[in-house]
Amino acid sequence: AMHSSRRIWCLDGDGAALMHLGAMATIGHVKPDNLIHVIFNNQAHESVGGMPTTSPAARFALMAQSCGYPSTRTVSTMEELDRVLSDLPGLMLPALIEVHTAVGSREDLGRPSIGPVENKTAFMDRWSNNRKR
C-alpha cells in the first residue's frame, strides 16, 4: 500500500486478525492513505475446521481506532455494508470495516490450490453474482 497509488483492499478473517494484531498497529502508525482493511468476523477459524475464535470479546473497530486508523465501521447486514461502501469515498484512509457474518463456507473449501490472482477473480465473480440477487 505504501508504494502504490492504487486503492488496496486487505481481506482478513477474525482469527487471522487476532493472531496478527501487530499489523493493525503498524497500519495505524504508517497510515497508508489508500488502504481499506476488511475483517470478516464469523467468530471461527473456518478455513481450518471451524474452531471458535475469541473474537466475541474483541471489538475490532475500537482496536483499529486505538491503533490510529482514522475511519472504522462495523456492519452486520448487506444494507449496512452497501451504505459503508457508498460512503467510502468520503472516509479518511486507512479505514477498517468489520463485517459480522455467519459461520458457513463453500462445500469445496480446502487449502489453497490456486494462486492469488485466480482467488481474486473467483471472489469478484462470486461477489458480483451474490449482489445481483
Per-segment meaning from a language model:
Residues 1-122:
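Thiamine diphosphate
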Residues 120-133:
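Short, flexible loop segments at boundaries between secondary-structure elements
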